Amino acid sequence: IAHRDRMRALLTQERAARQTVNRFFASQLSEITAAMESGRKDASEDFWQRISSGQGLTFDVTAIRAAAMDALNQLIDWNQQDEALLRTLNPVWEEAFNTGAKSIEQNFGITAVRAPRLTDYLRQQGLKRVRGINETTRDKIASALADGIEAGESTAQLVKRIQQHLPDMQAERAAAIATSEAHTSMQAGSFAQMQYGGCTTKTWITAGDEDVRDSHRSQNGVTVPIDQPF
């Protein structure tokens, strides 16, 4: 029962996180394409001037990709994008963390001496993941731009390429990101609740069905100190 309850709670967190990440990606795409259409981030940095440097290098795929990435890096402030995504995911982390902590108390009766909180360390780990998410977005856009440049597309066609292809890619990523972020934060909340509740050990217990991996089945029943990996 406890396992089913936790799985239901996790799925609820994943759905909410996926909606949040999808909204961020949609807003980010609008900002990127608007900047592409205006041609510049500010008066001194012309996006299409940088792109055009790649359009004369159609024989060199590496040079085209480098030119596309250089132009993209100058298009918008990616540090601000990191900060925006961090603000977006903070409530996701908090909610999933608290859900994980509550599930341990409700299902196992483990009461913490004091309420666990999402620590600065966990937020810093989250910031690393945020930067990785935006780096992947940059890579995907740069790759799409490079393909368009190789195909001899106009600037308008390049913008259209991004508008048409990026949403599908980002939707798939949003699902994976939501699963990862919700699971990581729920596990962190559960672990913190057990620590604050005075637990000193943890025991690996499998679901006991045919879906259990051999490597996990061999760990069934193994007990280790709570702060050590299995």
Which residues does each PLM region occupy?
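Acidic, glycine-rich two-metal-ion catalytic cores of nucleic acid-processing enzymes
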Residues: 169-230
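N-terminal leader/targeting and assembly helices and adjacent pre-domain segments
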Residues: 1-169
